[in-house]
C-alpha cells in the first residue's frame, strides 16, 4: 500500500470500528460499473469514503498484508471477459440491433504476456472493429500479446473520445487483465487513421496505465490559423507523454491524414524534452505509402514499443489534466484537477522531498503517494509546492 502525504490538513474523523472500515472499503470497491464508474456522483462518494478512512490508524505490517490480500481477492471477483477469440459485446443482453460495446478478441488468447488495444479508423457514420482486428491479430499473437479491438460506441469524427468510448476502453483493459492474468505493466495502445488519433489521445490521457502507444496514419487534434495552416495541437497530449514509449508512423503523401499534425506534435515533443527532460519518442515518416499500413505491416510498428514496460514510479511527472474524472496520474491524486493547467511533480531524493510546481497557482485537494522505493520513509519527508513547504514529517502507511 502507498504512503500518502496530503498537501492540505485532513479532516478529523471519529474513530471507525473495524466493521465500519470494512463496509466503507467494500462500498468504495463496488462503486460504479462500466457505464457510471466516472460519473460525478460516484467520484464524489469515493472522495467522501477516502476522507472517512483518514480516521483509520496507521497500518502495521501484518495489517498491510491482510488489506492487500483483501483488495486482490475482491478485484478477482469483478466482471471478466469471455475467454475466447472472436466478436462479442460488453453489454450483450439487449436486442441485436441495440447491443453496445462490440469488441473483437485475437492475438495470443492462451497465456499472453501483454495486452494490445487496437483502435479502428472511420469517422462520422463509419468505423468497424473487425478490419482492424484482422490487421493486428497475427502481429499481436507473434509477440505474445492478447489483442482486443473495440468498436467506438458512436461513430463520430472523434469516436474514441465521444459518448463513453474512452471509459469503455478502460473497462476492457481492466477486465482483460483480470481474465487472462496479464502483466499490468505491459499494456499498449495502437491504431490506424482515427485509431491513430485514439491511441495518441487516450494514450496521453492515461499514460500512467500504459507501457507504450503506437499511432499509425492518425494524429492528435490539430489547431489551425485563419488560413488553415497547422501550428499547434490540442492540450493534454504532449506534457502527459513524458514517461511513455511512443512511436508515431506517418506517410508524407497520405491524402486522408496529411503529415502536418504529426509533424507539429513531434516538434512540440522536442520542445517539451528540452523543457522537462524525459520522453521516449520516435517519429517514423516514410513516403509513397499513402494512407496504408506501415511498411512491413503493423508488426513492424509494434516492434517499436513491445519491449517497453510501464514506469510506475517516474522521477518526474508532468500532467496536464483534460478530463474532470481523471483524478489519479502515476503517484499523485488531484480531487478537483484544474483543466489544462500543467503540474510538474519531482522526487528529490537528495533532500528526501517531493517538489511540485503549478506555475504559481494554488493547489488544493492533492495527495502524494509514496513507498520505500521512492524516498527514505524512515526519515522526515517534505512536500514543497511552488517553493513553499506545505508538509514535513515521518510518514506511516495508511489505508
Residue ranges of each PLM-predicted region?
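A domain-start/cap signature at the N-terminus of enzymes
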Residues: 7-114, 389
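C-terminal catalytic histidine-bearing segment of alpha/beta-hydrolase fold enzymes
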Residues: 9-10, 249, 255, 259-355, ...
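Gly/Ser-rich "nucleophile elbow"/oxyanion-hole loop immediately N-terminal to the catalytic nucleophile
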Residues: 107-111, 158-194, 204-210
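Active-site machinery of serine-nucleophile hydrolases
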Residues: 112-179
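The conserved beta1-alpha1 loop
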Residues: 117-121, 217, 250, 356
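Primarily recognizes the serine-hydrolase "nucleophile elbow" in alpha/beta-hydrolase
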Residues: 124, 185-240
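Short, proline-enriched alpha-helix->beta-strand connector loops that line the catalytic pocket
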Residues: 240-246
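Surface-exposed beta-strand/loop patches in extracellular or lumenal glycoproteins
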Residues: 360-381
